[in-house]
Amino acid sequence: MERHYYTYLIKEEFANHYFGRESVMFELFQDYHWTSLEKQQYEMTEKQIQYITQPIPILHMHQRLKMNLNKTDYRQLDYIYRIALPKAKGHATFMMKEHMIEIVASGDYEAETIFFEVLRKVSPCFLAMDFNSKRYGWLNPVKERNFV
């Protein structure tokens, strides 16, 4: 079964605030991507998402991907990277957009894990969501800060 992850870089202040309450963010993004909202409601949801997210650092991502994928059999076409595991055990496609990264994978989880590991090294504030299976979470959990 194919897995489709929508991955956003959340601004640190919101990542800290919503740590442990990711379901609230999941519902917001799910409404945005998977629900037929009325135009006004869609525009409001889009503004909320723009407010809590930051653009993907495209150049930095290219550098990190190339550095970390050098021992992996991968192909690249512009903003798209594709990994195919040996013996057809699985594959994953990584598509960078201005405000989101989509990862589509099937077979073993190893291929998408390679991409998630790269994202973890870039920022602890990436939130990945698979709306079909209702799975979501921080790629590198944001540590709760204790204020005295």
From Swiss-Prot:
Keywords: Cytoplasm, DNA replication inhibitor, Sporulation. The keyword Iron does not apply. GO terms for cellular component: cytoplasm. Induction: Up-regulated by spo0A. Expressed during sporulation, commencing between 90 and 120 minutes after sporulation induction in about 20% of the cells (at protein level). It is found in: Cytoplasm. One of its GO terms (biological process) is sporulation resulting in formation of a cellular spore. The keyword Repeat does not apply. Its main location: cytoplasm. It comes from the Bacteria. Interacts with DnaA. Forms a 1:1 complex with domain I of DnaA. This is Sporulation inhibitor of replication protein SirA. It comes from Bacillus subtilis (strain 168).
